[in-house]
């Protein structure tokens, strides 16, 4: 098959085993893509010339194809033939936009190869003296070109790291060496099902059966997890953890050189027996880490737990849910864990009917569970309904004892399932204040921005030193034109006043990270915003450092390679780096 793609003349190795020649003609933006192995394929993404992916696994897989016996080789060949037939049949019908790689990984959503550390990067302006350490950001970066359905969230995890040491800056990016990635790299093609892009309808069931058949013959090993570790990052107990809610975290080290290295799956010394949500919360006062784990197959569908500052896990608290709920984020207050039980749920039986297992259940009532942090069971959880509320992310929550309320700040998204399922209605993400009355069981919700100021706000944070306590400001990505991010906003949560930092014409970024000047700053907004920015005209990327009080640009770091639009990040101080395990 041939394809029309845009923008540059390059050679690109999408996977270690397949080389593609891309012929770009400017300004017509037409590309002919030829596969020099045995198949032809297409992808509508602007791919950039970068070094080839390393063919040599950093971590030796527990199995090797060279050790397969005759029956395994025969089974592998037969199952590959079955999969090829399945893909051919699947591609006879148009893919929905939410599963079409030509949409999901187009332009600067397209993957990049790994980049070894590059030092002494050019800086414009002056980097504040208080910034010493490493800014790390996670994202989805598929190692192999998709052969069928693919959602942005399905990509392999890649961490981008910008290290600042006394004004000198270095950059690197590396795959997180998940069990999934290591096995697929050894096999030379993707075999693990993609949770969103592929697991829908009858073809999704067939893919699951194929995957388990490969497991029966010892061609893959899913006993050590299937996660992609592409969403969240947290530095806890002297470890940088890369996370996605489909697995336990992965421990990633920042090397003294500024490069990155995967240590491996981290289950907190065998204490964590289940998956863990990608947005754990660290209480800035106690130092405890709070987390959730959900299961889409069997009860309990949801569990809550915490870790002490030195990594000791509490017993699980089982949260009673009637159906498994999609729960990407949650919140904490000084005394409570705030659990959103919303209307986007998992119904695997929908696949039998030919549909998606992730659905918007209009008959379900959205609610929040308020669980005491030290609860040993769910007996004292308080449920408060909040009609038609779906927040993909919650930015903060706090208690107001004088009114018996918990205040939740989040971006309410409509249509609720638009990230996962194709919708005709335009997506809206409205910054909202939700007040949950623990005494009456009632709730209210209001938009924080005036109608004239309304913009989509998604991805961001408050000052993490104030997490779980009342905050005045939130720093959030301006998700327009969706799904791109044209800048970020500083919102006064008490007045609704909004100030914006816009990247400029054809320049887009991602999540803004707020970095306090120091932990003892008197003013909540005394610090800096760090954010990647990509220029789609020049195809160059940079790191911007913006004064959080004035929103004036303090410095930019020119990066040696393209940084795709990604997900969430954190900052590790130079002091914490020295204490890494």
UniProtKB/Swiss-Prot annotation:
One of its GO terms (biological process) is response to water deprivation. Has a 11,12(11',12') 9-cis epoxycarotenoid cleavage activity. Catalyzes the first step of abscisic-acid (ABA) biosynthesis from carotenoids. It comes from the Eukaryota. It holds the Pfam family RPE65. The keyword Oxidoreductase applies. One of its GO terms (cellular component) is chloroplast stroma. This is 9-cis-epoxycarotenoid dioxygenase NCED2, chloroplastic. Coiled coil: none annotated. Its cofactor is Fe(2+). Its EC number is 1.13.11.51. InterPro entries: Carotenoid_Oase (IPR004294). Binds 1 Fe(2+) ion per subunit. Keywords: Abscisic acid biosynthesis, Chloroplast, Dioxygenase, Iron, Metal-binding, Oxidoreductase, Plastid, Transit peptide. It comes from Solanum lycopersicum (Tomato). Fe cation binds at residues 279, 328, 393, 568. Pathway: Plant hormone biosynthesis; abscisate biosynthesis. Its main location: plastid. It catalyses: a 9-cis-epoxycarotenoid + O2 = a 12'-apo-carotenal + 2-cis,4-trans-xanthoxin; 9-cis-violaxanthin + O2 = (3S,5R,6S)-5,6-epoxy-3-hydroxy-5,6-dihydro-12'-apo-beta-caroten-12'-al + 2-cis,4-trans-xanthoxin; 9'-cis-neoxanthin + O2 = (3S,5R,6R)-3,5-dihydroxy-6,7-didehydro-5,6-dihydro-12'-apo-beta-caroten-12'-al + 2-cis,4-trans-xanthoxin.
């Amino acid at each position: 098959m041939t394809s029309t793609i845009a923008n540059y003349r390059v050679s690109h190795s999408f996977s270690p085993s397949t080389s593609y020649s891309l012929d770009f003609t400017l300004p017509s933006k037409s590309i002919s893509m030829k596969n020099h192995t045995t198949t032809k394929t297409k992808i509508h993404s602007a791919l950039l010339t970068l070094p080839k992916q390393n063919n040599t696994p950093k971590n030796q897989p527990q199995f090797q194809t060279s050790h397969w016996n005759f029956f395994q080789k025969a089974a592998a060949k037969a199952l590959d033939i079955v999969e090829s037939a399945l893909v051919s049949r699947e591609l006879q019908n148009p893919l929905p936009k939410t599963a079409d790689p030509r949409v999901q990984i187009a332009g600067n959503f397209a993957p990049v190869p790994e980049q070894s550390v590059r030092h002494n990067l050019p800086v414009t302006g002056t980097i504040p003296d208080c910034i010493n350490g490493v800014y790390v950001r996670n994202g989805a970066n598929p190692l192999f070109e998709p052969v069928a359905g693919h959602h942005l969230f399905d990509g392999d995890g890649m961490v981008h790291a910008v290290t600042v040491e006394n004004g000198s800056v270095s950059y690197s990016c590396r795959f997180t060496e998940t069990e999934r990635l290591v096995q697929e790299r050894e096999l030379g093609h993707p075999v693990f099902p993609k949770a969103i892009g592929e697991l829908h309808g009858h073809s999704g069931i067939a893919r699951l059966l194929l995957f388990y058949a490969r497991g029966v013959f010892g061609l893959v090993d899913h006993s050590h997890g299937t996660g992609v570790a592409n969403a969240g990052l947290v530095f806890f107990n002297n470890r940088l953890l890369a996370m996605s809610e489909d697995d336990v975290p992965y421990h990633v080290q920042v090397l003294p050189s500024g490069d990155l290295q995967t240590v491996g799956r981290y289950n907190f010394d065998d204490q964590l027996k289940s998956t863990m949500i990608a947005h754990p919360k660290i209480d800035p006062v106690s130092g405890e880490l709070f987390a959730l784990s959900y299961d889409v197959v069997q009860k309990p569908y949801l569990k809550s737990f915490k870790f002490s500052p030195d990594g000791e896990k509490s017993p699980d608290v089982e949260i009673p849910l009637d159906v498994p709920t999609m729960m990407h984020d949650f919140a904490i207050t000084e005394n409570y864990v705030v659990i959103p039980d919303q209307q986007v749920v998992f119904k695997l039986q929908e696949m039998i009917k030919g549909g998606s297992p992730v659905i918007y259940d209009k008959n379900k009532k959205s609610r929040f569970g308020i669980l005491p942090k030290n609860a040993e069971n769910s007996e004292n959880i308080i449920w408060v309904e909040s009609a038609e509320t779906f927040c993909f992310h919650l930015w903060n929550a706090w208690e107001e004892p004088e009114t018996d309320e918990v205040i939740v700040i989040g971006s309410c998204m409509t249509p609720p399932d638009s990230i996962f399922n194709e919708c005709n209605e335009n997506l809206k993400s409205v910054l909202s204040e939700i007040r949950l009355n623990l005494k009456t069981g009632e709730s209210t919700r209001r938009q924080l921005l005036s109608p004239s100021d309304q913009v989509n706000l998604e991805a961001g944070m408050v000052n993490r030193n104030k997490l779980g306590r009342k905050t005045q400001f939130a720093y959030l990505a301006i998700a327009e034109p969706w799904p791109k991010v044209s800048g970020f906003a500083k919102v006064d949560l008490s007045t609704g006043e909004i100030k914006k930092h816009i990247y400029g014409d054809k320049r887009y970024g991602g999540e803004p990270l707020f970095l306090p000047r120091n932990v003892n700053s008197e003013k909540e907004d005394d610090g800096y915003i760090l954010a990647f920015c990509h220029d789609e005209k020049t195809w160059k990327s940079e790191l911007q450092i913006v004064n959080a009080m004035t929103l004036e640009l303090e410095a930019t770091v020119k990066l040696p390679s393209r940084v795709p639009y990604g997900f969430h990040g954190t900052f590790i101080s130079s002091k914490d780096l020295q204490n890494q395990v």
